[in-house]
């Protein structure tokens, strides 16, 4: 795990802010951020930045590892990261879980941020700006639909031909309550379009490998659209299942035991400052067991 908890014994009275700065070799501002997130504790109590500490303390901090260090492409303005599955794009409050943002900022500094996001369950390419201005410019490309995103998905059933799924999606307003995290197809929702192209089929498992191109960017769009045409993604526990099963899935997710979702952001194409970029990610390892007995290619 990128977040580790280490124990330290402080022999002389020391200001907490200076202790964190010296241990992590960071700026005072960065040290203050760690303290604000309650990552330094003594006797199981969060330590304040102005507090003088001595004795045994425990510090939770980000320690990069190879899993989240997947920087696959870089320019002076941005980097592209290959996010692993079951990793958040952004951190959530005071919880100490894997976050791609920490990885991005460990590479490029505190002003670096993702220009878009992937679901926790989805792996693949994430574009990140190195400066506040480049983040703003890259986000504008996504808002203006000038970035072509393609995904790979393994879905249940035989998909015999390409299709266009055009169904409006209503995104949730209150994601804290029970199953309200789910988006839904509704005439009250925004127009949502997904292009689906079959690549191959495993007749023994009755699973299709699909190339997916979303033309809009609604929450859980690909997952919901495929479920709505009876081709639920392998590992999907939120859409196309009974409410009881969805609740069980969310509980397993909280326990980090949810099944792996077979959805991968495989490529990004865009123009930035006069240059055209096409960046691709290889087929993820978790797809491989499903692809051993492909009967044909389209």
Curated annotation (Swiss-Prot):
GO terms for molecular function: catalytic activity, acting on RNA; pseudouridine synthase activity; RNA binding. InterPro entries: PsdUridine_synth_cat_dom_sf, PsdUridine_synth_RluA-like_CS, PsdUridine_synth_RsuA/RluA, RluA_PseudoU_synthase. Pfam families: PseudoU_synth_2 (PF00849). The keyword Isomerase applies. Its EC number is 5.4.99.-. The active site is at residue 119. It catalyses: a uridine in RNA = a pseudouridine in RNA. The keyword Isomerase applies. Gene3D superfamilies: Pseudouridine synthase (3.30.2350.10). PROSITE patterns: PSI_RLU. Keywords: Isomerase. GO terms for biological process: enzyme-directed rRNA pseudouridine synthesis. Belongs to the pseudouridine synthase RluA family. This is Uncharacterized RNA pseudouridine synthase HP_0347. It comes from Helicobacter pylori (strain ATCC 700392 / 26695).
